[in-house]
């Protein structure tokens, strides 16, 4: 079997128009299945026509079995083929003003080196969501500078040096003049998991997390065929190395291209499947991945695979390029930057990295994932999952997990979708899983994993630091801590070692902060930051101190380097205590700015108690979507009503969940019903009745967050719906720019656009049959007075839906007064009217509108404002068994609802809830 397959049937040609694209178009939804694809579970369209049969060049080596591959039925060999799920690409505002502003990129990629150049990795959960093949827009990126603008029609690759027939090959010649090889290969940056090393001691490299790894099917001409066509000389002719040079202009060494080399022996070895790919996953290469052509050396580190390749030079000596020597080395642990330069350690050949080492990572549970411990979860095993890979074509043969620090090991189940090439080499990652009894996890402090390959190489237990932070492959360990995800219950929260880039979170980062704080505290006497007007807070706090205050008993936050104690404000916060508690103990600068007005920002100064100590380590910013790591003090997280066994998407209120837009319906000129798919089709959203979610998006370069209540059933599997009234630009004189988020949602493309959601949020939960939990306290009501305006109907709708689904057991009476501008603006009217007619003893509905647009229809409800008379006529009077729920514009609540309910004997402190 072969991982590099010569086509055996007529294929379509890759179109090379007169003006070839400089950027790849969005991925096609119509990917055809290929019977000869060398990977189970994926299929790609063919890109080229096979050339005429005949020798590629003057053969200098016997390879009689060169053409004996590819005869079997690939459908039978690899099973059913799957379509790739589309990942969107768009112009990223973060690229504005840079040389890469023309490139479309996936917005979910985590940037590791600021705006430019792009170095990024996908979110680990998103990477694993796609399984064996990584969509090209989600593939990790390592760029040293600006991306060259490639043009298929004019691009050439020069082959020169110790060859008898130097050539300058066009892209058409590469694509149509050589047999095509299709090679599935996992690419890994040598710095994968580097941040773990940086937590011990800073290296010279940036913070790669555990997702600097991706897998694609690459298609291109074999390097061996190209060199033979050009008459590569033999070793006797001193042809010992093959050098590659890219097109980008870089600063290294005073100015150079990116270049490196491999031995001639490697380049001519047919078993190594080295190719010059021009396609990835059945599409032309993306600009970030080397369009129009690059080098692929399977089983090797990414740093050897030159992108935008322009020159291939056969030489006697290895490459003398600056990046060949000053990058991709594993130096001994005692060698620091000064010693490496002084004693020329960079040039010692024994420290160069070529083949990947053995490595594996735990991906499930995710960082900050919470496993509730209850009667349901303890009756079934919990599945731990991850990926593993090795280099040099070696097969992964074993993965083991330990719960006791290596005293005993459990063998994992391997999932190896790839078949070896005909030389027995494996170029791709595999996946592993193991089922653990929940009670065993309850007694564990950490979970560690290690892997073995076919040469019985395995991973060291402890991290081995090196100057460049390369090839980190110690046991991957996650910590297991007890928390309280539900009032009266306990749960387990899992903590990964780090989070990528400058995101905080992770047990190694927490340990680093503690050590730094202890060392720095005696010497840090005064703050150097600019004080706010409130000068009372002169104290300084470390981030580790802030993290201790993550509960409703003590809720601290950090905004723009200042520390605030918001405990006293929890009960008065308009968005409810949960909105503060999900960020308590963390730096929430970005999220605070995204949803608060200048007035709110000024109000915040009242609660300032001091400033955050910065120690120069660069890890004090807490913009991670996961928040801090002291999760034993999390606010109560209630389990949603759900189908037994269905996993919850909103497993942590601190974590953003990417959701794809799968349907959009226009209910009126400005009302839309959006349907979003959850990351996994077997998940439920996990939103309790009465709670809401934050929808998060980056708009014009800034984070925007808005609260929404889904209108779909709380136990709907795989997706959820949002009913949204779109506020368009120039429609209302008070808001000439319209609604920022609603217009953004309106612009999303069905099938390819994503939003992030987080939650559950809110201080109210309806637990059924008249029972509520309000700010953590139980409250029972037999009658509900529901008053709302506009889109404020959605939380009411959610409660109504829950009550009516539980008939006849739920005897709660609901009296709804719903205000809008006109009869055309009433949302969900058909459903409300139908329910009111079907359940007259449970639901009564009364509408109030500002103006009647169609008097001929015979409007029978109120016109004008919500008044005391209207409320007295259509909602019950206050009492111990009555609860008022309100949701609408602040003026409506302040002037129309609150004072009139107070006149109707409502206890506004205990019997009135504003969503």
Curated annotation (Swiss-Prot):
Binding of FAD, residues: 706-709, 723-728, 735, 740-742, 791, 794
Disulfide bond found in the keyword field: yes
Record GO biological process: nitrate assimilation; nitric oxide biosynthetic process; sulfur compound metabolic process
UniProt keyword Amino-acid biosynthesis, yes or no: no
Comp. bias regions, Low complexity: 16-26
Cofactor: FAD; heme; Mo-molybdopterin
Keywords noted in UniProt: Disulfide bond, FAD, Flavoprotein, Heme, Iron, Metal-binding, Molybdenum, NAD, Nitrate assimilation, Oxidoreductase
Residues annotated to bind Mo-molybdopterin: 189
GO cellular component: organelle membrane
InterPro entries named among the record's database cross-references: Cbr1-like_FAD-bd_dom, Cyt_B5-like_heme/steroid-bd, Cyt_B5-like_heme/steroid_sf, Cyt_B5_heme-BS, FAD-bd_FR_type, Flavoprot_Pyr_Nucl_cyt_Rdtase, FNR_nucleotide-bd, Ig_E-set
Domain Cytochrome b5 heme-binding: from-to ranges: 538-613
FAD-binding FR-type domain boundaries: 654-767
Co-factor binding details: Binds 1 FAD per subunit.
GO molecular function: FAD binding; heme binding; molybdenum ion binding; molybdopterin cofactor binding; nitrate reductase (NADH) activity; nitrate reductase (NADPH) activity; sulfite oxidase activity
Record-linked SUPFAM superfamilies: Cytochrome b5-like heme/steroid binding domain (SSF55856), E set domains (SSF81296), Ferredoxin reductase-like, C-terminal NADP-linked domain (SSF52343), Oxidoreductase molybdopterin-binding domain (SSF56524), Riboflavin synthase domain-like (SSF63380)
Catalytic activity: nitrite + NAD(+) + H2O = nitrate + NADH + H(+)
UniProt feature, compositional bias: Basic and acidic residues: 88-97
Major enzyme class: oxidoreductase
Segments of this protein annotated with the region Disordered: 1-102
EC number: 1.7.1.1
Purpose: Nitrate reductase is a key enzyme involved in the first step of nitrate assimilation in plants, fungi and bacteria.
Family statement drawn from the similarity comment of this UniProt entry: Belongs to the nitrate reductase family.
Subunit note: Homodimer.
Protein name: Nitrate reductase [NADH]
Organism: Hordeum vulgare
Species classification: Eukaryota, Viridiplantae, Streptophyta, Embryophyta, Tracheophyta
């Amino acid at each position: 079997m072969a991982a590099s397959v010569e086509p055996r049937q007529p294929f379509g040609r890759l179109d090379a128009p007169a003006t070839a694209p400089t950027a790849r178009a969005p991925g096609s939804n119509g990917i055809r299945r290929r019977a000869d694809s060398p990977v189970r579970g994926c299929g790609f369209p063919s890109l080229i026509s096979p050339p005429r049969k005949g020798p590629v060049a003057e053969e200098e080596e016997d390879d009689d079995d060169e053409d004996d591959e590819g005869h079997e039925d690939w459908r039978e060999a690899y099973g059913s083929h799957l379509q790739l799920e589309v990942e969107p690409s768009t112009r990223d505002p973060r690229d504005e003003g840079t040389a890469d502003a023309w490139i479309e990129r996936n917005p979910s990629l985590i940037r590791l080196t600021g705006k430019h150049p792009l170095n990024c990795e996908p979110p680990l959960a998103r990477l694993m969501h796609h399984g064996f093949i990584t969509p090209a827009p989600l593939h990790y990126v390592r760029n040293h500078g600006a991306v060259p603008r490639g043009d298929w029609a004019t691009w050439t690759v020069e082959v020169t040096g110790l060859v008898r027939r130097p050539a300058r090959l066009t892209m058409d010649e590469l694509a149509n003049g050589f047999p095509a090889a299709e090679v599935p290969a996992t690419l890994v940056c040598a710095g994968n998991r580097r941040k773990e090393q940086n937590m011990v001691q800073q290296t010279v490299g940036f913070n790669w997390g555990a997702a600097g790894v991706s897998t694609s099917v690459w298609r291109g001409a074999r390097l061996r065929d190209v060199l033979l066509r050009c008459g590569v000389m033999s070793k006797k002719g001193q042809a010992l190395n093959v050098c590659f040079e890219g097109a980008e202009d870089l600063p290294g060494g005073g100015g150079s291209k990116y270049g490196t080399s491999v031995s001639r022996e490697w380049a001519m070895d047919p078993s190594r499947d080295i190719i010059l790919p021009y396609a990835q996953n059945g599409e032309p290469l993306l600009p970030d991945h080397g369009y129009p052509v690059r080098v692929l050396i399977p089983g090797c580190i990414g740093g050897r695979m030159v992108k935008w390749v322009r020159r291939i030079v056969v030489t006697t000596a290895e490459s003398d390029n600056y990046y060949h020597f000053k990058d991709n080395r594993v130096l001994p642990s005692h060698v620091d930057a000064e010693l490496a330069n002084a004693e020329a350690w960079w040039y010692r050949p024994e420290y160069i990295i070529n083949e990947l080492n053995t490595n594996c990572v735990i991906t499930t549970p995710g960082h900050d994932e919470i496993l509730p411990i209850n009667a349901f979860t303890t009756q079934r095993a919990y599945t731990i999952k991850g990926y593993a890979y090795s280099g040099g074509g070696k097969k992964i043969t074993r993965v083991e997990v330990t719960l006791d620090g290596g005293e005993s090991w459990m063998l994992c189940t391997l999932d190896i979708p790839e078949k070896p090439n005909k030389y027995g080499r494996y170029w791709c990652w595999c996946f592993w899983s193991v089922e653990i009894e929940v009670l065993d996890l309850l007694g564990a402090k950490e979970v560690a994993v290690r892997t073995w390959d076919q040469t019985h190489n395995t991973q060291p237990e402890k991290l081995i630091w090196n100057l460049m932070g390369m090839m980190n492959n110690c046991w991957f360990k996650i910590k297991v801590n007890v928390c309280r995800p539900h009032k009266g219950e306990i749960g387990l929260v899992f903590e990964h070692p780090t989070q990528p880039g400058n995101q905080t979170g992770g047990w190694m980062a927490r340990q680093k902060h503690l050590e730094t704080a202890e060392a720095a505290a005696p010497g840090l006497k005064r703050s150097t930051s600019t004080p706010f007007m409130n000068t009372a807070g002169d104290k300084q706090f470390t981030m580790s101190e802030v993290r201790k205050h993550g509960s409703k008993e003590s809720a601290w936050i950090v905004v723009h380097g200042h520390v605030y104690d918001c405990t006293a404000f929890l009960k008065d916060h308009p968005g409810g205590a949960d909105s503060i508690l999900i960020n308590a103990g963390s730096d929430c600068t970005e999220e605070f700015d995204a949803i608060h007005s200048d007035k709110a920002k000024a109000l915040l100064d009242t609660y300032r108690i001091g400033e955050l100590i910065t120690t120069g380590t660069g890890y004090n910013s807490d913009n991670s979507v996961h928040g801090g790591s002291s999760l034993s003090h999390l606010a109560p997280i209630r389990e949603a009503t759900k189908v037994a066994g269905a996993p919850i998407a909103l497993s942590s209120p601190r974590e953003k969940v990417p959701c794809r837009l799968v349907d959009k319906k226009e209910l009126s000129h400005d009302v839309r019903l959006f349907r979003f798919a959850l990351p996994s089709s077997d998940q439920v959203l996990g939103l309790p009745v009465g709670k809401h979610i934050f929808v998060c998006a980056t708009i014009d370069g800034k984070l925007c967050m808005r609260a929404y209540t889904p209108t779909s059933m709380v136990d709907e599997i795989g997706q959820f719906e949002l009913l949204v009234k779109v506020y368009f630009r120039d429609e209302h004189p008070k808001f000439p720019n319209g609604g920022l988020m609603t217009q953004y949602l309106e612009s999303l493309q069905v099938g390819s656009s994503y939003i992030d959601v987080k939650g559950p949020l809110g201080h109210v939960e309806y637990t059924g049959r008249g029972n509520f939990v309000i700010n953590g306290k139980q409250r029972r009501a037999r009658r509900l007075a529901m008053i709302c305006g506009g889109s404020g109907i959605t939380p009411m709708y959610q409660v109504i839906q829950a009550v009516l689904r539980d008939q006849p057991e739920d005897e709660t009476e609901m009296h709804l007064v719903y205000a809008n501008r006109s009869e055309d603006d009433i949302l969900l009217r058909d459903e409300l009217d139908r329910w009111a007619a079907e359940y007259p003893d449970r639901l009564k509905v009364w509408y109030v509108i500002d103006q009647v647009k169609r008097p001929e229809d015979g409007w029978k409800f109120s016109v004008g404002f919500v008044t005391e008379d209207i409320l007295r006529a259509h909602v019950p009077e206050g009492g111990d068994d009555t609860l008022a729920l309100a949701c609408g514009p602040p003026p409506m609540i302040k002037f129309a609802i609150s004072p009139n309910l107070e006149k109707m004997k409502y206890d506004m402190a205990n019997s009135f809830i504003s969503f």
